[in-house]
From Swiss-Prot:
Belongs to the EF-Ts family. Associates with the EF-Tu.GDP complex and induces the exchange of GDP to GTP. It remains bound to the aminoacyl-tRNA.EF-Tu.GTP complex up to the GTP hydrolysis stage on the ribosome. The keyword Chloroplast does not apply. It comes from Synechococcus sp. (strain RCC307). PROSITE patterns: EF_TS_1, EF_TS_2. GO terms for molecular function: translation elongation factor activity. This is Elongation factor Ts.
Amino acid sequence: MAEISAKLVKELRDQTGAGMMDCKKALNETSGDLTKATEWLRQKGIASAEKKAGRTAAEGAVGSYIHTGARVGVLVEVNCETDFVARGDAFQELVRNVAMQIAACPNVEFVTTDDIPADVKERETNIEMGRDDLGNKPEAMKAKIVEGRVNKRLKELALLEQPFIKDSSLSVAEMVKQLAGKIGENIQVRRFTRYTLGEGIEVKQEDFAAEVAAMTA
């Protein structure tokens, strides 16, 4: 495979408005062919989605999902630019898919890694720095290992970084970008809440043997 230069990635980005990583992936998939890479991005719905990302998305919908057995429930707000799109089947399906994704991902706490507070990042870094397997590593190597582990952990906490449950070849972010490209509007997952039945409730543990003994004494 031909090496993809930074200059070629920048050229594709300038032409399409897609993100750097998306451009690099497109060029890798097409062996560095700029025209084919542009077509690849358009097919994925990415080429035009990035240019729309800066536009205001004030319409949208609050979606809900209750998992089978009513033990997990989700509320999620997804925004778009117009009420017309918000009422459309494609957008409504996306909102439901995002809600289902949240229900399926109990570890997810934030929409993106940028939303993760500094104290959470610091906590995760301290945890990784204290791992026993790093004790004899050189400081430079240790820092690199910790950075990689922390980044991996932060991605586990971010909704948009998760593999899409209906197509694991896509992340949730890529799935959203695809629809944004197809409908021609900026789409943003703004916030969500996940409820688990009984979460946070301390359940009293009964000593049934002692209870029976007391009743028969």
